[in-house]
Curated annotation (Swiss-Prot):
It comes from Bordetella avium (strain 197N). InterPro entries: Exonuc_VII_L (IPR003753), Exonuc_VII_lsu_C (IPR020579), OB-fold_nuc-bd_dom (IPR025824). Its EC number is 3.1.11.6. This is Exodeoxyribonuclease 7 large subunit. It catalyses: Exonucleolytic cleavage in either 5'- to 3'- or 3'- to 5'-direction to yield nucleoside 5'-phosphates. The gene is xseA.
Length: 452
């Protein structure tokens, strides 16, 4: 990457250059000749200025180069490098003209080896995606009102404290089961996968949270493990992941049924706030009360209409007695009519016989005797029918409920207004209504003794 000075270049065509002109020309030459590139080295002499800019030296065993990273780019790195850190920097070579020192002006930084990790991440992501493990059709919706929530994380993790605090605040009634496992380290991924499988096998929780706090890509790498991803995909319980911060994505996030940006957010997604639940229950109770009141009002209206149409037993009895008297008069009248007609015919025959044969006085006497016997028979029959009518009237009065109540009896009705005739139809504590001859009484059943 060598560049010669052109003899006819405007700057170098002059016989004598100032130092500033020289440095400016060299700086322009370097910027044109060397494209942006990646450089790997060790951080030393790191300084973070009050302005937010980073100044440090990037070195290896054989050389060193001054490096600067301005505040806007430094804020996007995601970590603050420390002396001794191996990093990979993307930047361009520039010349600091006041001193004539060349430097590396960085616009991106990552920890050394992150490129390999990202490639491994991408390969695993593509593999699992091709198997359908990320498909939306596989995702399950966590229960809105879980009975118990499981948490897979480290017992020492700040994420666990955040989750417990959020759940205690939002849903103190929910039981919490912790499945402890390290969240970083050599065996973290396998132990996390084992706890997910254990929670799936036990089925003692309704929702499972897989959480840890933020960190570097190396700190979060356990959650990019294939075995853990398959354990989450095979879990019989809906899984909510909350790993790192909002900008962090892991393979576990893609496989989980629901991804939360933080552990606290995962806890919030796992349950409905108690206040919201109580409010919803209050609204539901109000709607139920209004609906029940409407039903009671309609039932009361129907009862009023039915009561208006219902004839009391006394009225029914009076109506029947009136009808009975009418029938009795009609019966008496119908019995007298044929009797009077027969007597008139006999009298007419007797008169005709008397005119034609005075000697038939004996026959006339006999006819009169028969007429009297017929009259007595008709009267006896009428009397017998009158006695039967009186007996029927007495029976009708005996069956009158008002008459029965007047003798000291009572009618017992249940809460629905039905007449109760069997003690076994009642239960202790049930409300009943007792109808008396004068008024009614409400009572509660304290003892039931069926007839043996």
């Amino acid at each position: 990457m060598t560049t010669g000075f052109a003899a006819k270049d405007d700057v170098f065509a002059r016989d004598i250059l100032s130092v500033a002109q020289l440095n400016q020309a060299v700086g322009q030459l370097m910027e044109r000749s060397i494209p942006p590139l990646w450089v790997r080295g060790e951080v030393s002499n790191f300084t973070q200025a009050a302005s937010g800019h980073w100044y440090f030296t990037l070195k290896d065993a054989g050389a060193a180069v001054r490096t600067v990273m301005f505040r806007g780019r430094a804020s996007m790195v995601g970590f603050v490098p420390r002396p001794g850190d191996e990093v990979e920097i993307r930047g361009r070579v520039s010349l600091y003209e006041p001193r004539g020192d060349y430097q590396l002006q960085a616009d991106a930084m990552r920890r050394a080896g992150v490129g390999n990790l990202f490639e491994a991440f991408s390969r695993l992501k593509d593999k699992l995606a091709s198997e359908g493990l990320f498909d939306a059709s596989r995702k399950r919706v966590p229960l809105r009102l879980p009975r118990a929530i499981g948490v897979v994380t480290s017992l020492q993790a700040a994420a666990l404290r955040d989750v417990l605090s959020a759940l205690a605040r939002r849903a103190p009634q929910v039981e919490i089961v912790i499945y402890p496992a390290p969240v970083q380290g050599a065996d973290a991924a396998s132990r996390l996968a084992a706890q997910v499988r254990q929670a799936s096998a036990r089925r003692e929780v309704d929702t499972l949270l897989l959480v840890r706090g933020g960190g570097s890509i190396e700190d979060l790498w356990s959650f990019n493990d294939e075995d853990l991803a398959r354990a989450v995909a095979d879990c019989a319980i809906p899984v909510i992941s909350g790993v790192g911060h909002e900008t962090d994505f892991t393979i576990a996030d893609f496989v989980a049924d629901l991804r939360a940006p933080t552990p606290t957010a995962a806890a919030e997604l796992a349950c409905v706030p108690r206040a919201e639940l109580l409010s919803a229950l209050g609204h539901a109770a109000s709607r139920l009360s209004r609906a029940q009141q409407r039903r009671l009002d309609l039932a009361a209206q129907r009862l009023d209409r039915a009561s208006a149409q219902l004839v009391s037993p006394a009225q029914r009895l009076a109506h029947q007695c009136e009808r009975l008297n009418t029938l009795r008069h009609r019966l008496a009248a119908s019995a007298q009519r044929p009797l009077a007609a027969s007597a008139a015919r006999l009298t007419g025959l007797a008169q005709r016989l008397a005119r034609r044969a005075p000697q038939t006085a004996r026959v006339q006497d006999r006819v009169q005797s028969l007429a009297q016997r017929l009259l007595r028979g008709q009267q006896a029959g009428l009397a017998e029918r009158g006695v039967r009518l009186q007996a029927l009237a007495a029976q009708l009065r005996a069956l009158d409920p008002e008459h029965t109540l007047a003798r000291g009896y009572a009618v017992l009705r249940d809460a629905q207004g039905r007449v109760v005739s069997n003690a076994s139809a009642l239960v202790v504590g049930e409300g009943v209504r007792i109808d008396l001859a004068q008024g009614r009484v409400q009572a509660d059943i304290t003892d039931v003794q069926p007839r043996r």
